[in-house]
């Protein structure tokens, strides 16, 4: 069994990095510790120009770089020095003049940055596929019993700390090894994804000839948290996040207080935050079981998020119990006080949490308080995944959204200006409600939400029941449907409860009948031409 605590010193290091963040300081510290440094190309020049006494790999191997730098470190004196097992291969290493290399600091050609550039063609991409780097990384990682491999600049400080303490322990080298294989796996996956989008039947030099989906799909996620259990107590679970941080999300949020997030907390918080991101003016979204149960938008001069919370809560006070609350503005102390005094809440998330709000919520130690930061107005493109038995469904993220200018009026009566505001609001909410989704709204407040029914008309009935139960007036409210009405019964039902305007995608074989039903009831109806199924 390997001794976990014995420290191995470093006498010789090879440094060759594309990302030179912190490398000069790292090399200087190594030199002060008496470490002999081997280096290549641009890294060697940087070190030499800044007074670090490094040996160029070509001088060390006696074999010059060739083929425009394609062959630099692929030499037995390099890989033998990395792969050689101390105490096993010493004789053969001595016979061939191979010196042991105890530490390898390497990161790889910037393939991702290269292919992200406009106009990047296949030859350019190919020249930015690192060969020597991954080979050294894998060699050092394989021989981690004797060699330390450093691929992240963030590890330089801890490596130096270990060396100053007498060397790196096996536990440290094992952790560095794991990071190295994660690094090369992500790198190769990125290359495979890119190459897998190229259609060889077309012009392989053209970015326009690329498919949207690669032949194999490779993506890397990093474990952020192991959870007590999954969706149910008998299921095990963990939370993995994308290796590269994107826009503000539940994955990037900082937890300021409260119990550890559960599996369901994460899923529901994501639903709440993504919904509230849809609104420009101050908004509050309350979610239960991944469905919005209350949403409201209130301008700053009319009460802002404090009033928005009151209205969102009023939609469905029963469902709000134990829910998730999201805001698109800084959470202030007054709003925080209203929440914790009124209801039991699992999670509160906002782009920023004021100190006053922190102080208020601190009295409720179990409440999870998350600060996610601001997000851009333009939503980033990305992928959504759905696991099925034996496979994975992959689709582009549903960033589609309409404005008032996109609406097509299909009835005799056009909606009023206030109805248009409410229709667009209700449509934004319906996008985040499980299908079949029906949302009743009035004055930019949800007054009834019907979610997840197999029949669209039943979702409409549930929305009306919810509104009545909450004591909210449906008369003069608008209705949003995430997909078209297959029959006129949905409109007939809306007319009975007093709905004045409807927003839906359109596209049914019976659109004419549905429009006629709206005209008969004096209901204004608009088509969006865009569906928002959510399963």
UniProtKB/Swiss-Prot annotation:
An MF annotation (GO) of this entry: IMP cyclohydrolase activity
GO terms for biological process, alphabetical: 'de novo' IMP biosynthetic process
Assigned EC number: 2.1.2.3, 3.5.4.10
Presence of the UniProt keyword Protein transport in the record: no
Gene3D superfamilies named in the record: 3.40.140.20, Methylglyoxal synthase-like domain
SUPFAM superfamilies the record matches: Cytidine deaminase-like, Methylglyoxal synthase-like
Pathway assignment: Purine metabolism; IMP biosynthesis via de novo pathway; 5-formamido-1-(5-phospho-D-ribosyl)imidazole-4-carboxamide from 5-amino-1-(5-phospho-D-ribosyl)imidazole-4-carboxamide (10-formyl THF route): step 1/1; Purine metabolism; IMP biosynthesis via de novo pathway; IMP from 5-formamido-1-(5-phospho-D-ribosyl)imidazole-4-carboxamide: step 1/1
Pfam family, one: AICARFT_IMPCHas
GO CC entries: cytosol
UniProt-listed InterPro entries: AICAR_Tfase_dup_dom_sf, Cytidine_deaminase-like, MGS-like_dom, MGS-like_dom_sf, PurH-like
Catalysed reaction, written as an equation: (6R)-10-formyltetrahydrofolate + 5-amino-1-(5-phospho-beta-D-ribosyl)imidazole-4-carboxamide = 5-formamido-1-(5-phospho-D-ribosyl)imidazole-4-carboxamide + (6S)-5,6,7,8-tetrahydrofolate; IMP + H2O = 5-formamido-1-(5-phospho-D-ribosyl)imidazole-4-carboxamide
Keywords for this protein: Hydrolase, Multifunctional enzyme, Purine biosynthesis, Transferase
NCBIfam families for the chain: PRK00881.1 (NF002049), purH (TIGR00355)
Domain notes: The IMP cyclohydrolase activity resides in the N-terminal region.
Protein family (similarity comment): Belongs to the PurH family.
Protein name: Bifunctional purine biosynthesis protein PurH
Protein's organism: Pseudomonas putida (strain W619)
């Amino acid at each position: 069994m390997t001794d976990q605590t014995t420290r191995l010193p470093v006498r010789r290091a090879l440094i060759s990095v594309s990302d030179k963040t912190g490398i000069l300081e790292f090399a200087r510290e190594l030199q002060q510790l008496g470490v002999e440094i081997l280096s290549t190309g641009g890294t060697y020049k940087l070190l030499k120009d800044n007074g670090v006494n490094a040996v160029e790999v070509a001088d060390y191997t006696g074999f010059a770089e060739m083929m425009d730098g394609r062959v630099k470190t692929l030499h037995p004196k390099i890989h033998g020095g990395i792969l050689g097992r101390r105490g096993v291969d010493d004789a053969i290493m001595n016979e061939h003049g191979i010196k042991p290399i105890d530490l390898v600091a390497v990161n790889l050609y910037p393939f991702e940055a290269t292919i992200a550039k406009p106009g990047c063609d296949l030859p350019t991409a190919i020249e930015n596929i690192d060969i020597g780097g991954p080979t050294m990384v894998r060699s050092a990682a394989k021989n981690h019993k004797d060699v330390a491999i450093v691929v992240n600049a963030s590890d330089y400080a801890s490596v130096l700390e270990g060396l100053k303490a007498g060397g790196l322990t096996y536990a440290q080298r094992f952790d560095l090894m794991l990071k190295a294989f994660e690094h090369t796996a992500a790198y190769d996956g990125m290359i495979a994804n890119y190459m897998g989008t190229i259609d060889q039947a077309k012009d392989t030099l053209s970015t326009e000839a690329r498919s949207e989906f690669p032949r194999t799909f490779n993506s890397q996620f990093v474990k952020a948290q192991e959870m007590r259990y999954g969706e149910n107590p008998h299921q095990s679970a963990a939370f993995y996040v994308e290796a590269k941080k994107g826009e503000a999300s539940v994955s990037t949020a900082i937890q300021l207080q409260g119990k550890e997030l559960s599996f369901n907390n994460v899923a529901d918080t994501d639903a709440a935050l993504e919904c509230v991101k849809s609104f420009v003016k101050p908004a509050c979204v309350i979610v239960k079981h991944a469905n919005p149960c209350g949403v409201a938008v209130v301008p700053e001069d009319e009460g802002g998020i404090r009033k928005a919370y009151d209205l969102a809560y009023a939609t469905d006070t029963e469902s709000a119990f134990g829910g998730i609350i999201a805001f698109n503005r800084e959470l202030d102390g007054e709003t925080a006080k209203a929440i914790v005094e009124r209801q039991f809440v699992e999670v509160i998330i906002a782009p920023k949490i004021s100190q006053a709000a922190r102080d208020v919520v601190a009295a409720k130690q179990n409440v999870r308080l998350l600060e996610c930061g601001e997000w851009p107005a333009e939503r980033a493109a990305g992928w959504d995944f759905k696991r099925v038995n034996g496979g994975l469904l992959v689709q582009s993220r549903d960033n589609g959204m309409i404005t008032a200018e996109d609406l097509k009026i299909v009835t005799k009566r056009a909606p009023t200006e206030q109805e248009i505001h409410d229709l667009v609001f209700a449509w934004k909410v319906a996008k985040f409600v499980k299908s079949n989704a029906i949302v009743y709204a009035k004055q930019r407040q949800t007054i009834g939400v019907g979610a997840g029914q197999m029949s669209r008309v039943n979702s409409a009935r549930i929305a009306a029941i919810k509104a009545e139960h909450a004591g909210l007036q449906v008369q003069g409210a608008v209705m949003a449907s995430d997909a078209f009405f297959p029959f006129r019964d949905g409109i007939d039902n809306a007319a009975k409860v007093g709905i004045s305007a409807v927003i839906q995608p359109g596209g049914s074989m019976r659109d004419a009948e549905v429009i006629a039903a709206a005209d008969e009831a004096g209901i204004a109806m608009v088509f969006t031409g865009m569906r928002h199924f959510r399963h």
